[in-house]
């Protein structure tokens, strides 16, 4: 099964990125083959809707689960429609989180924030 | 002449200044661009109300025609579209209604539907035509409403007073785009200076002629005034801190219609502003 993690760098020694939509890279990790693939998150630089685009990229990668510290409302809607499960990371290490995931120790992410909209003038 | 009244945050006296200026001018239009919390109409209590819906266009895909090519998803710069499980999802609040996806869909699968985001209400209060933009609750951006307000105001040849949204974000920029002159309202505190600086930056970026009205002035030190002096900013008027004025305002009364003292103060301000604005236009040429 493939899982996705927003990460700060394109290396397994990198850490989980605190942002989902604006993470520089998205790690797609295959739990069976243990292969890892780092996608450039093309959404990171976009003006708005970064979460939506990042979520679309993850869906397109074929991942079935995501480990992330947080997720915006819109992105969550995309992931829900794609039936991708969201898990909350326990710490910053990619490897630790993958291990915890394999052992079924991660809990589902329920903290979905309303998103930071640049427009609207607030 | 179109005059925009702005301040870095709410409660500074922006509505006090714009409402009273409009009321003291002979024949004028007051436009409330603070679409999230319009309250100018509470003072004017306009009659003969007319309401007009403001809508934006939203794309929708016909699942029968859509082949899932994702041309639209890739095109949308605002990332308002996602294609998931053979279905196009449109994020209403993210969509800017640019119509691009509709143009670029090779299957002609996208059509537009209207969605109401707010309304514009206008009416008459004595010498003032009062126009207010009101954004529906839960909407993210009032920019389309402000655009519509300003479009309508372009037809006016009377003096127009724009009560801008607080702050300095998109909606404020939209509001001051066609103003001939900007009045910045500031409070005499350190926070007041901070808020003033925000709008000061903005009017400079937009290269608008402007001046400051210092509100709630006491005899004591006034950091906002110091800021103006340091930066050679024109001080148009100093409105004294005055319980009577505050009470009238919080009771929804228009000071210039109640009290000759304030009528004189705002008439003076209007004169100063007109002179400043004319001076600016003259030196442009
Ligand atoms: S109308 Fe424009 S902003 Fe809205 S979804 Fe289509 S391309 Fe994106
Ligand atoms: S461009 Fe048209 S056909 Fe292609 S995914 Fe979008 S709606 Fe469907």
Protein language model regions, located:
Chain B
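Short beta-strand-centered segment that lines the nucleotide-binding/catalytic pocket of NTP-utilizing
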Residues: 28-41, 114-119
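Walker A (P-loop) phosphate-binding motif
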Residues: 1-25
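Ferredoxin-like iron-sulfur electron-transfer modules
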Residues: 8, 21-24, 45-68, 79-97, ...
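Switch II (G3) loop of P-loop NTPases
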Residues: 34, 132-138, 146-171
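Short, well-ordered beta-strand core segments
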Residues: 4, 28, 182-183
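C-terminal lobe/tail of nucleotide-utilizing enzymes
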Residues: 202-285
